From Swiss-Prot:
Upper taxonomic lineage: Eukaryota, Fungi, Dikarya, Ascomycota, Taphrinomycotina
Xref: PROSITE patterns: DILUTE (PS51126)
Record has RNA-binding as a keyword: no
Domain Dilute: 180-464
Subcellular location: Cytoplasm; Golgi apparatus
PANTHER family: DILUTE DOMAIN-CONTAINING PROTEIN (PTHR16027:SF6), DILUTE DOMAIN-CONTAINING PROTEIN YPR089W (PTHR16027)
Keyword Cytoplasm carried by entry: yes
Gene Ontology CC terms: cytoplasm; Golgi apparatus
Keywords assigned by UniProt, alphabetized: Cytoplasm, Golgi apparatus
Organism whose genome encodes this protein: Schizosaccharomyces pombe (strain 972 / ATCC 24843)
Pfam families: DIL
InterPro entries, alphabetized: Dilute_dom, Myo5p-like_CBD_DIL, Vascular_dev_regulator
Protein name in UniProt: Dilute domain-containing protein SPAC25B8.08
Length: 573
């Protein structure tokens, strides 16, 4: 991550870059005209005509992505418990988006959310000596204590970068320095708090929105190619951090909740009948030995963490494509982790234990079926085979459990045809995994040990498949395809949204897609009065910012400069 520290020295030198400010009587009125010049940001810069439509059909509102449905959910308390969060800290109150307060941007309940001078600010004018203070206020110490502030940093630094690129001396490259500093600080803050999922999701949302602004700004798109690449890299890093945090939370209770938990009546005695330590005296209170006596370790505790993660991604308006990949990654990890737990522990390799684990896995399948509509991927994604299929991530685990439930009967029946058909149907398992499960199989109370003859048949099947693989493979070593355990550390590469998909989600002109009505308020780039108040409370003031004198190269250019003409030229396509 050395690239994120490249700008550390530059950030520290910003406060020393200017010793004095020159404010002329002629520049100040010009600045005022620039501030007050009116234009429609979405029309001039974010023109989004003829983009694709995804989430709604026949005029449906697509409210699944709206705040109303999210905030009115009856499971908010469960979500807080699943992630050990106080959801009050991220302001999950319900708002009526059709109310006059929201339509007039008075949704913070205190003051108008956009600056009084102009509802669509095109620049944020600042002094380069104040960059470090801006980073301190809106990155290092920033917490979104109001819903209106969740995406405020990306808006502030985007509008500030427009001023830096268009009005600051080009030789200083202040726009590039500013955005690099912003991304560098975000990376450092999230690395220092990898277990704070709210913080990481918040910055993933802001970096995503910044990437959208830069791609849609015709003037900045070509100037910020390297910045956009850094945004993509940081988004990938944050995506991994968020997934790893959710995995860590699930892993704490995964074995207790998904493998040991007994939800089927009558299986507890069978599971205990073949206990490892038969000489140890059992507790007199049978209830104390049952995982059912610990409600914190149950299949529901796992699905709550997944639901909580998805809920946070929705609350912070993470792009639907990224949301889907995040949940898919969690299911992929769950499938691999549970598979390894079962196959590497002999006490779980029994018919009764497999039945119980399979019953618990059904809670994951039920959750995926219920929530799949929330995870629809954009249909125009170039990969045609990119589909949301969470259940397939558990296929190897499910087939292992099926094999454990039927292998003893197959060994007793001695039917070669039935055995061959069964082995061929277990296409998600390799022969080594099939053989190991049978070899370590623990008979239930009514069963006997698996015969050696049956194991020899499985061993022959293993060797035959290995020879076929070697003969058909160009590479000599194919042993990696016959590994016993699944790789739990594999992360699928994050597929970032295309420009059209970003427009579909974040542009408030598009109808009926992405985040629906919320976009009309949430995604407009502006600097709210709340942010300006924070600046002034910390000694920064809009009145102290100024256009640099280098904008006017000589007296003639100074006399002929017209703000409206300048802005029109800058925003021309």
């Amino acid at each position: 991550m050395d690239q994120w520290s490249d700008n550390k020295d530059a950030i520290g030198m910003l406060s020393e870059s200017l010793k004095e400010k020159v404010v002329t009587n002629e520049i100040a009125p010009a600045l005022k005209e620039v501030k007050n010049h009116k234009y429609n940001f979405e029309t001039e810069i974010l023109n989004t005509g003829n983009v694709w439509n995804n989430d709604s059909k026949n005029g449906e509102s697509g409210s699944a992505f709206g705040l109303d449905k999210i905030f009115q959910s009856s499971d908010s308390g469960n979500i807080a418990e699943g992630l050990e969060l106080d959801l009050g800290n991220i302001m999950l109150e319900t708002h009526n988006l059709e109310s006059p307060a929201w339509k007039h941007a008075d949704y913070d309940g205190v003051a108008a959310s956009v600056n009084d001078n102009n509802n669509d600010w095109k620049f944020f004018v600042f002094d380069e000596r104040e960059i470090d203070s801006m980073l301190q206020l809106f990155v290092r110490d920033f917490r979104a204590d109001k819903p209106a502030l969740r995406l405020a940093p990306s808006k502030l630094f985007y509008l500030a970068s427009r001023f830096a690129f268009f009005y600051m001396p080009k030789e200083k490259e202040l726009g590039t320095v500013l955005l690099n500093a912003f991304l560098c600080e975000v990376n450092q803050v999230t690395q220092q708090h990898p277990n704070d999922m709210v913080l990481c999701v918040q910055w993933l949302a802001n970096v995503s929105l910044l990437l959208f602004y830069l791609k849609k700004d015709n003037k900045l798109d070509d100037l910020t190619v390297d910045i956009q690449n850094r945004c993509s890299e940081l988004m990938n890093s944050l995506y991994i951090t968020i997934c790893q945090d959710a995995m860590r939370r699930m892993n704490e209770n995964l074995e207790e909740g998904m493998v040991k938990y007994t939800g089927i009546q009558g299986l507890e005695d069978i599971l205990r009948s073949r206990s490892w330590n038969l000489l140890r005296r059992r507790p007199t209170n049978d209830a104390s030995t049952s995982p059912r006596s610990t409600p914190s370790a149950s299949p529901r505790s796992i699905t709550k963490i997944i639901a909580s993660t998805l809920h946070l991604l929705e609350v912070f308006y993470i792009h639907p494509l990224i949301r889907a990949q995040c949940i898919e990654q969690l299911f992929s990890w769950l499938g691999a982790r549970l598979f390894n737990i079962v196959i590497s522990n002999k006490k779980y390799l029994s018919r009764a234990a497999a039945m119980e684990t399979r019953f618990n896995i059904s809670s994951l399948e039920e959750w995926s079926q219920t929530n799949s509509p929330k995870l629809q991927k954009p249909f125009d994604y170039p990969d045609e085979d990119l589909k949301v299929d969470l259940i397939s991530k558990l296929l190897s685990l499910v087939q292992l459990l099926q094999w454990l439930q039927c292998l003893y009967r197959l060994s007793e029946d001695e039917d070669p045809r039935a055995l061959q058909e069964t082995l061929e149907s277990l296409d998600a398992l390799n022969p080594r995994q099939i053989y190991t499960a049978a070899k370590l199989y623990r008979p239930d109370i009514t069963e006997t040990k698996v015969s050696k003859t049956f194991l020899k048949k499985l061993d022959a099947f293993h060797e035959e498949k290995l020879r076929e693989k070697i003969n058909s493979s160009d590479k000599g070593d194919v042993s990696y395809e016959f590994e016993l355990l699944k790789d739990e550390t594999v992360f699928s590469p994050l597929k970032l949204p295309t420009k059209a998909q970003l427009i579909n989600a974040y542009s408030y002109i598009v109808s009926g897609n992405g985040f629906n009505e919320d976009r009309k308020i949430v995604f407009q780039p502006h600097v709210s009065n709340i942010l300006i108040d924070k600046l002034e409370e910390n000694g920064l003031s809009m009145e102290r910012a100024e256009l640099p004198t280098s904008v006017f190269e000589d007296e003639l250019q100074r006399r002929e400069w017209r703000p409206d003409q300048e802005v029109e030229e800058l925003l021309s396509t």
